[in-house]
Each structure stands twice: as C-alpha cells, then as structure tokens.
Amino acid sequence: MGKSEKTSLGRSLVKHHNHMIQESKDKGKYYKNLQKKVLESVTEVSDIDAIIEQAEEAERLYTINHSSSTPLSINLDTNSSSSVIAAEEWREQQKIEEALHASSLQVPRRPPWTPEMSVEELDANEKQAFLNWRRMLVSLEENEKLVLTPFEKNLDIWRQLWRVLERSDLIVMVVDARDPLFYRCPDLEAYAQEIDEHKKIMLLVNKADLLPTDVREKWAEYFRLNNILFVFWSAIAATATLEGKVLKEQWRQPDNLQKTDDPDIMIYGRDELLSRLQFEAQEIVKVRNSRAASVSSQSWTGEYQRDQAVVGFVGYPNVGKSSTINALVGQKRTGVTSTPGKTKHFQTLIISDELMLCDCPGLVFPSFSSSRYEMIASGVLPIDRMTEHREAIQVVADKVPRRVIESVYNISLPKPKTYERQSRPPHAAELLKSYCASRGYVASSGLPDETKAARLILKDYIGGKLPHYAMPPGMPQADEPDIEDTQELEDILEGSESDDSAVGDETENEQVPGIDDVLDDLSSFDLANGLKSSKKVTAKKQTASHKQHKKPQRKKDRTWRVQNTEDGDGMPSVKVFQKPANTGPLTMR
C-alpha cells in the first residue's frame, strides 16, 4: 500500500466513538425528561421535602383518578407536648400504647396485580397503596405517647423488596448476632407467608464470632422455643478462610470458629451454609411443583415452572447481606462498604443449576423499640450524617462496661462523684474528652475534637472492637451492675458515722464524708457540661483581721493645675523655673 493511498479505518473508529457519545447523551436526556431520580434511601424528610412530596402525590392521584384525595399531613414537630408527666409514668404509658398499636406497624404490601395490567395502572395502584401506608404511620406519629423511629420513605426501595419476596422460595433475614431482635422484623415474615404459605423464613445470625459460646447457647435455646429457623454465621471469617488469611482482629473469638457437637450453636462455614440453604429451598420447590392445580391462579406462573431454587437475602442496612453473598459466591460480585445503603437494586447470582441467590437492598423498617441515636450506633443510619454526636456516644457508653472502654482505649475515665451512683455508666462528654486527650485530637478552636472522636468510637463499636451483646428476653443482661446500696448514700447525706461494732477500732480514725463534703461536691457540678475538672482547689490563706483594712489612697500633687480664678482661661499655667548656672567645681589655688 503506497503512501498516497488513504484508508478510512481511523475515520470509522472516530465516527463510531462520536456516535456512542451521542447515544449516551440522548439516553441521559431521555431519563431527564422522564424525571427519573437516582435510587437512594430516604429515611428523613424536611419541611420543604414533605410539602413537595405532598403536592406531587396529590397531583398524580388527581390526574389518574380525577378526584381530590385527602392531603398527606405530616407532623414534623416532634418536640410538642401538651402535658408534663413524670418520666416513669410516661414510660409505662408508652409501653402500653406500643403494645396496643403493635399490629399497625406493618410493612407496606404490594397491591394485587395481573399480567394484563398496564404499566400506568400498576404504578398508580402501588403509589396509592404506599400513600395509604404513609398516612397510617402519620396517624401513629400524631400520638404523643408513641415515638416512631426513622424508616424507609422511598417507594422504589420498597419495590425492590416486593420483587425479592415474590421470586424467592427461601427468604433469609440477615441479623447482627449482638442484638438479633433489634434487626428482626416479624411483620416481614408474616408478609412472606401472605404471598405464599409455603415460603420459609430463616434467620441468618451474622457476626456470630463476636459472641461467646455460652451466649450463643442461650440464643439458640430462645430461637428453638419460639420455633424460629436460625443459623449462626460469620461472613468475615468465611471470607478470610476462603482467601487463606488469618483474622487479625483480637476482639473476635477464635475459639468460637471451632467445631462443636451441637449443630445449633456451631458457626457454619461456606460449604455448610450453601448445603443448608439448598436443602431448605429444594424442599419448598418440591412442594411448589406439586401444587399443579394452584399454579394457574398465580400471577407469576413463570416462576413456578422452574426447578431452580431461589434464596433471597433481606434485612436492615449494614448487617452483612452483600458480604454473605460474596463469601458464598467465592468472589466479589456485590459492592461492600461500611456505609449503609451501598446496594441500590436487587441482584440475582446463579450458584448452580439448582440454586440462585438474590440480594435485596437494605431497608429501615418502622419500629417503636429504638431511638434514632441507637440506630446510628447500630450502623443502620449513616454515621457521617449525624449532627448530634453526644447522644449516639451515650448509647455506646450505656452498653459497653466502663472497664472495657478503659482497657480497649487505654484511657482513664473520671470516677463518679460521691453523691452519684457508683456503678453508673460514663457520660458521653467524659468519654469524648478522655479519648481526645489521649489521642491529641484538637479542633481549630482549641477545644477537643469531639466530632472526630465520636465517629471513630462509633466505627469501633460497630466493627466489634468494643465488645457488647444483648441477652435473650427474660435473661439478665451481660455485665449487669450490682444493686446499689442505698443505705450508704443515706449515711453520706445524713452525715452519720459508720458502725463501730461491725467495722472495729480501725474505723474510728477514718474520716466519714459528711454533709459539708457533699455540698462541696455539689458546688463543683456543672449543669452544662456535667462535671468540672477533678482538680483539688487549694484554700486561700487567711490573714489577720487587723491586716484586712484598706489603706487610704495616696494624695497626688496637683498644684500645677490652674485654679478657677477670674483671670484664668482654663489652661494650665507654665511656671517659670530657672536652672542655676553650673560654674563647675571649685578649684583651689
């Protein structure tokens, strides 16, 4: 080929590249014209968001149904209270109201549908059902005795859950082993049974290597008594075993991964869990295929004609659903981060011809039992978005014993005052200030950087560096403090002396704190920051009474000022002063 001859290969590649760019631009304009929003989790709405959402929903329903709908009134004022009730009485009334409205706290149901429905009709029915569900929760929020935690408010996220529940034979609810009941949603299990009575719900207790063996035994007994299908599992340990690595975290229990004789308390490995999931799902498939008469009445008939079992993973954000699937598949197929809400759409992964896994995005279910700060400390809500860090740190301080915090971080927390309960947990301010002082975290203002310290402590709490776990209902909590000796506090307040006959002669010389000492401690109490520094204040040295008088001020000489005379003009006068002539020293001749 000569130099004068030209080819069109390069020009064709450039045209193809420009064509692909133009197609991507047109595709973006198409989605923009459809006003298609990015799928993300929404747990809280502001005033303007609620107004816009209310207007959009009302306009859609009016356009479709040609009738005015009841406006969505969302009460965003959560601080209003019409009466002042004692704290204990208010808690009792709150428990009664929660038990009374427990049945109203449901997962939104998908309305019935058929393949003959159009896309617009199905979309309108789902939005109407979701709007009715939101109104029901708003009516619960209007009750002053009920505190509803943040929950998922994005309809598209709930649609992902509906699809996973419909196509799954075995539904695996992933929970955190340190508090399984906090992450369990009983109404989700009831909804799965409403879709198909032959569907099974399995509780996958993840992060089980953070629990001692005796605690796992108690939880296994609780699950058996309540007829709950459960399996203990550790996604991090399974991934490390698959990659041939050794866990470096000292806070994880290495002895827990050893095989035990009891299959209920053992921590399953990758192959064992796959076999268990396939066995449970195949049992459901056999029952499903035997119902030939009822197949025609189902709207998803195509799913019933297959022999492949589908296992769906559902649960709260950041409990380890995607990590579990990656460990079961054997490679990273789903995104995993410490920030909740990484998974946006449900994904199907084929393990074999007989088993398929389905990963669902994490959802925050509505509940009464927890607070917003407890959800942040549990990793359900993002840590980086919190605005009040002391409340979330107080949750950590209440659940982790004082000696454990001091041992893990190698710090010394301030001791309680004499008038306080000696077994009380440390305050959030005490923990944050001690942590910042030991690490040298200082903000630009010169004060301790409590925000940075709070984020690091919360991440250690979620990751397991700060060991904590809850016990089953009806059993004493771990590291429960002893009952406070109230008689000792009464003796301190009354200034009474200790019992000489019981203690002996040695106690006669000991100083028993009296009412003056208690008042001195009360004077060091700061309402804004909890407690002041524990430095000893030295008393001022008293002087003699005859030396306490104030000396009169020395009178200054102001004779140079002009007196108020008739000839005076108010200006200072200049006195004529003639310096004597210096004739020098006298010389003797």
From Swiss-Prot:
Keyword set includes Nucleus: yes
Residue window of motif Nuclear localization signal: 534-541
Binding site residues for GTP: N206, K207, A208, D209, N318, V319, G320, K321, S322, S323, G362
G2, as annotated region: 341-345
Top-level taxonomic group: Eukaryota
Region (Disordered) location: 1-26, 495-515, 534-589
Entry's Gene Ontology BP terms: cotyledon development; leaf development; positive regulation of ribosome biogenesis; regulation of auxin polar transport; ribosome biogenesis; rRNA processing
Compositionally biased intervals (Basic residues): 534-558
Residues in CP-type G domain copies: 158-366
Protein name in UniProt: GTPase LSG1-2
Gene name of this polypeptide: LSG1-2
